[in-house]
Design a protein with these regions (language model features):
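Short, low-complexity, polybasic intrinsically disordered segments
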Residues: 130-142
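Short, conserved glycine- and acidic-residue-centered signature motifs
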Residues: 24, 28-32, 60, 95-100
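Catalytic cores of nucleic-acid endonucleases
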Residues: 2-18, 82-130
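Structural motif
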Residues: 61, 75-77, 119, 132
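Anionic group-transfer/hydrolysis microenvironments
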Residues: 50, 65-67, 81, 125, ...
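Active-site metal-binding core of divalent-cation-utilizing nuclease and nuclease-like domains
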Residues: 45-75, 142
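Acidic-basic catalytic patches of nuclease active cores, encompassing PD-(D/E)XK
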Residues: 2-53
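Conserved catalytic cores of phosphodiester-cleaving nucleases, focusing on short active-site segments
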Residues: 64-87, 103
Length: 142
């Protein structure tokens, strides 16, 4: 029961309530939509969008922007990052260790919902201005 509570999906679809963050959220949603279209054009199939794990007293929470499946069955957990320019290292450089750990945690919770664990990897789609870069196996769970 403790594991279920720690890894409980918060049921959110990522839809916000608006307010001051609406512009940022809309921009993020648009980036995810662009990334998804790019990956689907490469043959990947969407499994789930915005998979979230709720925070709890002893849980850090986390989110995976996109979960897709390769033709060979590999499950791909994708973090989408967008920056208007490549200053400060660009979009890919903005994913620090703490963010990677939250993505890995959410992915591990998602994997626990499956009967069998398929091969998986962690990709990043970096959107810098008009440029989209797909970084396969950008980081690992270790």
């Amino acid at each position: 029961a403790a594991r279920a509570a720690i890894c409980s999906n918060d049921g959110s679809t990522g839809e916000g309530a608006g307010g001051a963050d609406m512009t940022t959220k809309e921009s993020g949603d648009a980036a995810e939509t662009r990334a998804l279209a790019h990956l689907q054009a490469q043959g990947l199939t969407l499994v789930q969008r915005n998979y979230r794990v709720a925070r709890g007293p002893n849980a850090r929470g986390g989110e995976v922007d996109l979960i897709l499946r390769e033709r060979d069955g590999t499950l791909v957990f994708v973090e989408v990052r967008q920056r208007r320019s490549a200053g400060h290292g660009g979009a890919a450089a903005s994913i620090g260790l703490a963010k990677q750990q939250r993505i890995v945690y959410a992915a591990s919770c998602y994997l626990r919902t499956l009967r069998a664990t398929p091969p998986c990897r962690f990709d990043v789609v970096a959107i810098d201005g008009d440029r989209i870069e797909w970084l396969r196996a950008a980081f690992d769970a270790g």
